[in-house]
Amino acid sequence: MNHPIHDQGPQWVAGFMSGTSLDATDAALILTDGERVLEFGPVAERKYTARERQALQEATDAARAWNWTGAAPEDAFEAARKVITETHAEAFEMLRNGAGRGILGPLAGIHGQTVLHRRPRPGQVGATLQLIDAIALQKALGVTLAYDFRTADVAAGGQGAPLAPAYHGALLERAGDGASAVLNLGGVANITARMADGTLFAFDTGPANGPIDEWVEGHGKGTHDIGGAYAAAGRVHEGLLAQLMEHDWFRELPPKSLDRYDFNANMARGLSLEDGAATLTAFSARAVAAGVAQLPDMPERVIACGGGRHNPALMAALAEALPCPVLSAEEAGWRGDSIEAEAFAFLAARTVRGLPISWPTTTGVPAAMTGGRLRG
């Protein structure tokens, strides 16, 4: 059943994303009816303080140790929920300050903070956990909240990820582009291709920034490889890279999904800082190339969005590994840092209209699936 605010037609919807890189809450406004993207509005970024990032990391670590066994680490989860509420409310206020008269609508889509994701296995349904205090956040924002986008898909037997493909497809349709694939380079990489008949085909390809960030941070050199400098100064260990590419993951057929920590920095154990960064960067690129090879049709180009596109070493490795050109989102005329936030605004609009947000070809769910819960 449609939500009453759907009756207003296309509207300005706010979207929010806090990724597994734990660097910031991204927010964006788009004008949409859940099928088309009509206009792009203001964007905002609320970076996390060291204290906030620590709370989110502690919740993630506690979730991994718990892994749905025994009592949940509620103290750590509650501290993270408080961070999510406060930072999202501040990001929303930043959007409000940047929006013109009448550009802040009655709806917001919130992803929450993923702290644990278990993909389905034969005979075992998957599980996923995004931390959010929907009651507190809806009260803080004062608009209808769409959230919890993944659990219905997982409960129905789907992977629960990726979910951005619905929006990627709308961007490609808006541009009249049926020949490109969209590559999101977050902690994990995922790719979306839009077939000639409009069918979306999407899946996680493997790691992207996650292991690289973890490797650099583990050496006390910051939270990520700024400018790809460490990777550029290192040597790729081809023997290790070949071993990594033998992982069972690359023999699995899509759709498929990963937890951020399914591939981690331990893969480079024993290497120097620079060589480890170079090898992990090359691995992320080769994993993407292996994923592109699993698409039904080879795209004419790949459009990269997400934080990884800011890493010149990763973009160079992708250009070398892929058989087609790699463009940044900006080269395609998109706002690369805001696409995931925009995606959850788009999914919120689809949720209030009762439209699907995942399909058999994007998450492996048995049939086109609606998702998301509404509050307010």
Regions picked out by a protein language model, each given a short descriptive name:
Residues N67-L131:
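Short beta-strand-loop/turn "lid" adjacent to the catalytic site in phosphate-handling enzymes
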Residues L22, A282, E330-G376:
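Glycine-rich phosphate-binding/hydrolytic loop that grips phosphoryl groups
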Residues G102-G112, D297-G308:
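Short glycine-rich phosphate-binding loop at a beta-alpha junction
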Residues L104-P165:
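Glycine-rich phosphate-binding loop and adjoining helix at the ATP-binding site
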Residues S18, A24-I30, P42-A59, A140-E173, ...:
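Glycine-rich phosphate-binding loop plus the immediately following alpha-helix
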